[in-house]
A protein has these predicted regions:
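Membrane-proximal helix-turn-helix segments that form the acceptor-binding/catalytic region
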Residues: 91-105
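Active-site proximal beta-strand in glycosyltransferases
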Residues: 73-86, 106
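C-terminal alpha-helical cap of glycosyltransferases
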Residues: 307-324
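Conserved acidic donor-binding segment of nucleotide-sugar-dependent glycosyltransferases
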Residues: 267-273, 282-287
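A short, well-ordered alpha-helix in the C-terminal region of glycosyltransferases
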Residues: 289-303, 313
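Active-site charged/polar residues at nucleotide-handling catalytic sites that mediate phosphoryl
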Residues: 45-46, 102, 305
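Catalytic phosphate/metal-binding cores of nucleic-acid and nucleotide-processing enzymes, i.e., regions
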Residues: 276
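Nucleotide-sugar donor-binding catalytic core of glycosyltransferases
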Residues: 1-46, 55-68, 106-240, 248-258, ...
């Protein structure tokens, strides 16, 4: 099997896709930080067939070490795939910068509409969704620390120019304004732009940043998890992670959501603030219905959207690129 070098620092990545490759019997080396010794271990000693980078990979490291990594990878003819996990909002500022810096052989993107942008650059490109890792995203006993009616895990926007703004106003605003038992984790909520967004979030609802390792506990402890979406044509990682955990997901009915999941079977969708209030009231009172949908959602992502399946897609893509 192919040997996989996975270059990522954040647990939100290292606890995901690498497990999928392991389940396909691919040896995996996780490279979290760059130094001369770590590059030697990852490239010269491990001798990978495929290197995967992603996200804002160019920002954490010095140019010297990045060039050393790509030079060594090229020397041993390692196939380099960049996974564009910040598309489409940050394609120019993030993905294109990473491509310029790391010079990958091919690109996979979470946004189907961005595929042709990479092909126009002369790079083989395909779509690859996020997924779930059943070894991490799974049922576990509730934790009283996270016992809330409604929770939201996700960062507040910087400029709120994407569909994420609409998601917040449909899902979060009506519940905050009515004083529901809500907890919000993530960056920048303490600098929330009240004037732009049209409502104020009480400070007791804002809980700060949450280690990724804690997220599954939250999903298993809260009764309803709000799932913001950033774009009509892509799905956030938390969509799959919440469902994989067995949590009940309330999101918005974007094209991508309704393409993969059935409303009130795998998750629930609110099209307006009024929908959100009605659905939250209903599902807080109807525990059995809420739990049945959560079980269905977990079953669906375990069947079709695990990182084992995503790893298989990457291997198939790499084989296709090699043949062409």
């Amino acid at each position: 099997m192919k040997r996989i070098l996975f270059f990522a620092h954040s647990s939100k990545y290292t606890l995901g896709l690498p497990q999928g490759f392991r389940e396909l019997n691919c040896p995996v080396f996780i490279l979290r930080d760059l130094s001369r010794s770590s590059i030697t271990d990852a490239i010269d000693n491990f001798r990978p067939d495929i290197m995967i980078t992603m996200g804002w990979a160019y920002r954490r490291y010095s140019r010297e070490y990045i060039e050393e990594l790509t030079k060594r990878a090229s020397k041993y003819k390692v196939k380099h795939v960049y996974w564009a996990t910040e598309d489409p909002r940050w394609t120019e500022k993030c993905s294109f910068r990473c491509i310029e810096t790391y010079k990958p052989n091919a690109v996979m993107t979470i946004h189907p509409g961005s595929v042709n942008k990479y092909r126009e650059l002369g790079l083989p490109a395909e779509h690859l969704d996020f997924g779930c890792n059943p070894q991490f995203n799974k049922n576990e006993p509730p934790n009283s620390k996270y016992d809330y009616d409604v929770v939201l895990i996700g960062n507040g926007g910087r400029e709120w120019k994407s569909y994420r703004k609409d998601s917040v106003q449909i899902l979060l605003k009506p519940l905050v304004e009515r004083g529901y038992n809500i907890a919000i984790w993530g960056k920048r909520w303490d600098h929330f732009n009240e004037e732009l967004m049209g409502f104020k979030i009480p400070t007791h609802m804002i809980k700060g940043e949450l280690p990724y390792e804690e997220t599954n506990k939250v999903y298993n402890s809260a009764r309803i998890i709000l799932g913001l979406q950033n774009d009509h044509d892509m799905l956030t990682s938390r969509t799959f992670e919440v469902l994989g955990s067995g949590g009940f997901l309330l999101t918005v009915p974007t094209q991508s959501v309704t393409k993969l999941f059935t409303n009130n079977v795998h998750l629930s969708c609110a099209s307006s603030p009024e929908d959100t209030v009605n659905l939250v009231n209903y599902f807080l009172k109807n525990t059995a219905a809420r739990q049945e949908i959560a079980r269905n959602g977990q079953r669906e992502v375990y069947l079709k959207h695990t990182y084992k399946e995503r790893a298989r897609q990457i291997l198939d893509f790499c084989n296709l690129v090699e043949r062409n």
